[in-house]
Amino acid sequence: SLNLLFADWANRGLNQWTIEEVSITLATGIRDYPGGTLTMTVGSSTSFSVGETLTGGTSAATASVTSKPSGTTLAITIPSGTFTSGETISGGTSGASSTLAAAVDLTNVQSTIDILSAVVTRDSTDFEIQRVSRSSFLNIPNKSQSGRPNQFFLNRQITPVLQIWPAPDNDTDIVKFNRLTRIDDVDAYTNTAEVPFR
């Protein structure tokens, strides 16, 4: 069927129209980021600190704050556990707390098939970061070393993780990457197929 054809195209790299650029603001000392956009909506994000660990009051799920895009939104790392809508989350260093407005949706990150290229932007200058293999990343002796990131590895789990090295040394660098995403599946005759005419 069409879904098998789409999977075959993705495997052969024929779905170039699904490439999109993603920008993630880096946080000091955090080296694992989602392979796409991942945010949580809370009552207020102003009292939380970038880099601190959030903990769910009832779920005990945890994630780190990578940036604060708005007064009610937190960009986060991939959670350990599952945050539940309506629970109170608290910050590990700031002591701030807020109510989670909706469950964290991993769909955007899980649609990532591959990361084709990446750069780190510092002071309006883009610096290329090199892709390394799983074994090369594993063999880095001191993964907590900090500096301007110059290598990345995409850990292709169900929810892909972008691992960078060295760990960022500030909260202002931005990683920009071109990711290849999954073609939206066809499940009803009323769907519009996510394919170009030519």
What are these regions (language model features)?
Residues 1-39, 99-198:
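Glycine-enriched, solvent-exposed interface loops adjoining structured elements
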Residues 16-103:
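Autoprocessing Asn-cyclization modules and mimics
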